[in-house]
C-alpha cells in the first residue's frame, strides 16, 4: 500500500477519508530500502537521537514552523487556549491546552469515553488481536504489561488503541472516574507508531517505552491505562495526583513532541464497545475520534 493511501473513518461524518501522512517519503525510505531499515533501527534504539530532536523543537526559532503546520494540516486553532503568537516554540504549541468547552465529555456513569484525540481500533476480545500477528508471532500481552499476573487479568478481556498523529491534540485524559494509582514505567525503545510502520510491526507496543496506570472504578473494574512513547517523543508527562479520585475527562498528562499511542485494557465482561467502532475495526479501519466521545458502555448481564 502506498504511503498516501492510508484510510480511516471520520466518526463525525461516517465517511472514509484519506489520512494526511507526515514525512511519507522518509517513511517509505525506512520501510522499503535495506539502508533505511538499518538506519531506522539504530535511530529508534538510541534515545540520544530522540532527545536531540526534542531539544531542537524547544528552540525559539521553531515557533516560525507553527503557522505553516497549522495551515497544512488544517488544525482548528480556535480551539486552543492561547493564540498562536503566545507559543514560544513548536513543542510549546505541540503540548497546547484547549479551551474548556472544546471537548465536551459524554455523560453517564456507565459510559467510558475516548481518552484522547486520535485514530481508534477496538478489540472486544483479545483473541481479535490475531489480525495483527506478524510472521506468525502473536501480540504478547505479558510482554506489553511486563507483569504475568497483571496480563492474566486482561487475557480474556477487551482492548482499545488510540493512535495520536503529530497534528493531533497531545494531552490525554481519564476515560472513566475512579481511583488512579501511580504509573509504572517500562523502559524501552522509541519505534515509530506511524500507521505504515504499525501495519508492518504491531509488536512495537511491547518494545517501546511505556507507562501503566491502573484505574479502579465501580462500573468498569480495574482498567489498565497505558501510554506508549514513539519516535521523537522524548518523554511522557503525567499531570495528575496518583492515589487520588479522578473525574472522567480530567487531564491525565501529555506527550512531548512527536506522535504516540494510548492503550486501554478492560477485564472480561466490563465494557461493550460502541457498534460503529467495532464494525470499522473488524474491517481493519481506524476511526478518528475526539477526546470525550463515547467509547463504550458498562457491560450489564
UniProtKB/Swiss-Prot annotation:
Protein name: Phosphatidylserine decarboxylase proenzyme
Record bears the keyword Protein transport: no
Family: Belongs to the phosphatidylserine decarboxylase family. PSD-B subfamily. Prokaryotic type II sub-subfamily.
Record PTM: Is synthesized initially as an inactive proenzyme. Formation of the active enzyme involves a self-maturation process in which the active site pyruvoyl group is generated from an internal serine residue via an autocatalytic post-translational modification. Two non-identical subunits are generated from the proenzyme in this reaction, and the pyruvate is formed at the N-terminus of the alpha chain, which is derived from the carboxyl end of the proenzyme.
MF terms (GO), sorted A to Z: phosphatidylserine decarboxylase activity
Top-level enzyme category: lyase
Localization of this protein: Cell membrane
Cofactor(s) listed: pyruvate
EC code(s) of this entry: 4.1.1.65
Keywords for the protein's UniProt record, in alphabetical order: Cell membrane, Decarboxylase, Lipid biosynthesis, Lipid metabolism, Lyase, Membrane, Phospholipid biosynthesis, Phospholipid metabolism, Pyruvate, Zymogen
Protein's membrane topology: Peripheral membrane protein
Organism for this UniProt entry: Chlamydia trachomatis serovar L2b (strain UCH-1/proctitis)
Complex and partners: Heterodimer of a large membrane-associated beta subunit and a small pyruvoyl-containing alpha subunit.
Catalytic residues identified in the record: 117 (charge relay system), 173 (charge relay system), 260 (charge relay system), 260 (schiff-base intermediate with substrate)
Reaction catalysed by this enzyme: a 1,2-diacyl-sn-glycero-3-phospho-L-serine + H(+) = a 1,2-diacyl-sn-glycero-3-phosphoethanolamine + CO2
GO CC aspect terms: plasma membrane
Alphabetical GO biological process terms: phosphatidylethanolamine biosynthetic process
Record site feature (Cleavage (non-hydrolytic)), residues: 259-260
Pfam name, any one: PS_Dcarbxylase
Protein function: Catalyzes the formation of phosphatidylethanolamine (PtdEtn) from phosphatidylserine (PtdSer).
Pathway: Phospholipid metabolism; phosphatidylethanolamine biosynthesis; phosphatidylethanolamine from CDP-diacylglycerol: step 2/2
Residues modified to Pyruvic acid (Ser): 260
Gene: psd
Binding note for cofactor: Binds 1 pyruvoyl group covalently per subunit.
